[in-house]
């Protein structure tokens, strides 16, 4: 399969290149960048010197359609809604890593992203690509989930799909490494601001909130809202999500683990930790795994769920490739069979 990557010089695009080079059924046909053309990636990223010699090109839809079966779009939000359309119309596989096609309500997108929304007919065509819970596996247009949304939804799915929790009780405390803020530097991501520090940001206003709610209410329409906070922590990669919920009825630790293990028994990238063991960010670094730890406090009737991912892999490029595997009828783990980097 021939693929093109639009937005190849961003962190998400770079991860796509790294991972796709390990995929036996995929060849990278073209690489595209808004910020640089006619130079190779190694000009900007010397670690790719022996990996990718193809020059960066301007975006030419006609050429991309001729040379590619699949297009990955790894741009910031607000761009894909315009540039994705020719490839969708041409019938190519299109996987968008930005947030432009995730929300089915255009007004919600414009409220939370502060940008004009994609055309209604294209939003309707896009399937939300939470890979473990894809409903239409034959769909060729995927809105790849956000990193916070992926960790949160995988953590909550077994309980919410079975309507086992008090719908008003969901509290999510999510922490991200600095790469989650993207490649463009800012005052808030400057080394002197982030090193030895922890910063709460976008309190009650992170753009992944409506995305999470959209999926949760598909599973349990009685959920009215979630309390969701996000923090930057001084690590490069990783999402560490701690979720607190109250079950409708008391549940034992064994019942809780059995529920999660049965839900994910056929999911190659979700690993449920043993009882009283909680995952760390390092145990999923540079991998497509989501590791989940569970606890139930009988005294407070609170379930704690710890869900960790690598924001650039399971939270972006890795899940995008997982979605490609599903739509192309490859093995779901093709190109993603590697162990995390440790330490």
Curated annotation (Swiss-Prot):
InterPro entries: AGPR_AS, AGPR_type-1, NAD(P)-bd_dom_sf, NAGSA_dehydrogenase, Semialdehyde_DH_NAD-bd. Keywords: Amino-acid biosynthesis, Arginine biosynthesis, Cytoplasm, NADP, Oxidoreductase. The keyword Flavoprotein does not apply. It holds the Pfam family Semialdhyde_dh. Signal peptide: none annotated. It is found in: Cytoplasm. Its EC number is 1.2.1.38. The active site is at 147. One of its GO terms (cellular component) is cytoplasm. HAMAP family: ArgC_type1 (MF_00150). This is N-acetyl-gamma-glutamyl-phosphate reductase.
